Amino acid sequence: MVTSVKGLAYPKHVTEDAETLARALNDAFGVHLFLDYGGTLVQSGAASRERPAPHVRRKLERLCRSDAFFVYVISSKSVHDLRELIGVPGLGLIGQGGLEIWEDGGELEHPVDIRHVDR
């Protein structure tokens, strides 16, 4: 069975699961939400400087204002590029495939495997 939501057709189990998830998240607190930039916030294979659509930015802003969520965007792009492209207050960024981590208002971190640190 297929259900139509906002003009898009989804198998019924997808919309039922989404509704169940939405109900669970209504009562959630401290949820860490990780979103991929390419293919999630912008189309996969999109131009390297493409910004998320205005409705996507508004949803990110709303999530970041909520006390229930910690929202991060993950990308192979640098944190610097992500900050310029997205620019949503309160959004955490993970760039270079995890080599850079930045939380709004914090310092840029470069995690290093302890095995590679001179002792």
Write out the residue ranges for each language-model feature.
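A short acidic, helix-capping loop that chelates divalent metal ions and anchors anionic groups
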Residues: 42-44, 102-103
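Non-catalytic pre-domain segments flanking phosphatase-related domains
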Residues: 1-37, 41-42, 48
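Active-site phosphate-binding/coordination module
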Residues: 51-119
